[in-house]
């Protein structure tokens, strides 16, 4: 069972990366919030991930899901205990930092949870019913970490790429979402802050 991988970036795709660890290349599936933290990373850059190894009789091909921190991985373990949220759906819905998702659960904010990809009103209520009282430590810890980077055209462009390629928005819609977020808050300095600005104003439906 693989629990941790360290190596260099070989290739970056829409929702996964190919990590070269020694002579072996591992395909690692990443939630959008983790992928956003890799903005600016290039081929050959060193990377490491805490890994959730997913394999069942119905899913015989191993799937490696990567996280930046043990905290993110621990939250993921709790998230998949919610009825109707399996590992692949959990990856899909983690479009906000875990601190914000946890806070929404603890405060019963079903409106924000319902904005996560693949999470409707019913699933949002299930998340609250199952996890409220269990994820406070993640909310207290705040947003998951990501490298501080200046807000540049590259940051905006790559955020658009994540919104389109991984979250399913149309290019024009994604560009408007990013532009609106940057107009409201021109001091955005991290990928999380940009996604936060987009989602907290209800633009991501």
Swiss-Prot record:
Residues 69-146 are annotated as: Domain II. Residues 152-205 are annotated as: Domain III. One of its GO terms (molecular function) is ATP binding. It is found in: Cytoplasm. Keywords: Cytoplasm, DNA damage, DNA recombination, DNA repair, DNA-binding. Residues 1-68 are annotated as: Domain I. InterPro entries: DNA_helicase_Holl-junc_RuvA_I, NA-bd_OB-fold, RuvA, RuvA_2-like, RuvA_C. Residues 147-151 are annotated as: Flexible linker. GO terms for biological process: DNA recombination; DNA repair. The keyword Metal-binding does not apply. The RuvA-RuvB-RuvC complex processes Holliday junction (HJ) DNA during genetic recombination and DNA repair, while the RuvA-RuvB complex plays an important role in the rescue of blocked DNA replication forks via replication fork reversal (RFR). RuvA specifically binds to HJ cruciform DNA, conferring on it an open structure. The RuvB hexamer acts as an ATP-dependent pump, pulling dsDNA into and through the RuvAB complex. HJ branch migration allows RuvC to scan DNA until it finds its consensus sequence, where it cleaves and resolves the cruciform DNA. Has three domains with a flexible linker between the domains II and III and assumes an 'L' shape. Domain III is highly mobile and contacts RuvB. Homotetramer. Forms an RuvA(8)-RuvB(12)-Holliday junction (HJ) complex. HJ DNA is sandwiched between 2 RuvA tetramers; dsDNA enters through RuvA and exits via RuvB. An RuvB hexamer assembles on each DNA strand where it exits the tetramer. Each RuvB hexamer is contacted by two RuvA subunits (via domain III) on 2 adjacent RuvB subunits; this complex drives branch migration. In the full resolvosome a probable DNA-RuvA(4)-RuvB(12)-RuvC(2) complex forms which resolves the HJ. This is Holliday junction branch migration complex subunit RuvA. It comes from Desulfosudis oleivorans (strain DSM 6200 / JCM 39069 / Hxd3). The gene is ruvA.
